């Protein structure tokens, strides 16, 4: 019950939940958190694979590259909002994208995940 209550308090939302984009088009995925967390993350998940970190941020107005940043930009205009931008979407960027937030960014710190955004690039 404690985990459920904690989860309900730690809201991370994403928009859109699904999107179809054309190759070469610009795509912006938005994430909003009400946790007052310093750290925010964008991951991608491909079929049959685990999560891979694209970009993260530990403070507003600053972003850092993750493990697979190529082809992506990120923007953290405020504590609550963290966007992932594909300037020129490509077929290889078809995936499910997850945003998460955490308090300290430590290895043992819980990350709270959004519901995911399914992106299909045609």
Curated annotation (Swiss-Prot):
Residues covered by region (V segment) = 8-103
InterPro entries recorded: Ig-like_dom, Ig-like_dom_sf, Ig-like_fold, Ig_sub, Ig_V-set, TCR_beta_variable
Instruction: Quote the cellular component terms of the Gene Ontology held in the record.
Output: plasma membrane; T cell receptor complex
Source organism: Mus musculus (Mouse)
Residue ranges of the region described as J segment = 109-122
Region forming the signal peptide:
1-7
Q: What is this protein called?
A: T-cell receptor beta chain V region C5
GO biological process, alphabetically ordered: adaptive immune response; cell surface receptor signaling pathway
Keywords, in A-Z order: Adaptive immunity, Disulfide bond, Immunity, Immunoglobulin domain, Receptor, Signal, T cell receptor
In its miscellaneous comment, the UniProt entry states: This sequence was derived from a T-helper clone.
Q: Which SMART domains match?
A: IG, IGv
PANTHER family attached to this UniProt entry: IG-LIKE DOMAIN-CONTAINING PROTEIN, T-CELL RECEPTOR BETA CHAIN
Please give the residue ranges the record annotates as the region D segment.
104-108
User: Which Pfam families does the entry mention?
Assistant: V-set (PF07686)
Q: Does the keyword tRNA-binding apply?
A: no
* Highest rank taxon of the organism: Eukaryota
The SS bond pairs are 31-99
Is the keyword Signal assigned to this protein? yes
């Amino acid at each position: 019950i404690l985990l459920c209550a904690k989860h309900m308090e730690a809201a991370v939302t994403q928009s859109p939940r699904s999107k179809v984009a054309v190759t070469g088009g610009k795509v912006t995925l938005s994430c909003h958190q009400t946790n007052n967390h310093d750290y925010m993350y964008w991951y991608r998940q491909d079929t049959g694979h685990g999560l891979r970190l694209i970009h993260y941020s530990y403070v507003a107005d600053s972003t850092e590259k993750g493990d697979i940043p190529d082809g992506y930009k990120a923007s953290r205009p405020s504590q609550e909002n963290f966007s992932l931008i594909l300037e020129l979407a490509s077929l290889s960027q078809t995936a499910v994208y997850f945003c998460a937030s955490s308090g300290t960014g430590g290895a043992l710190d819980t990350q709270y995940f959004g519901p995911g955004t399914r992106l299909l690039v045609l």
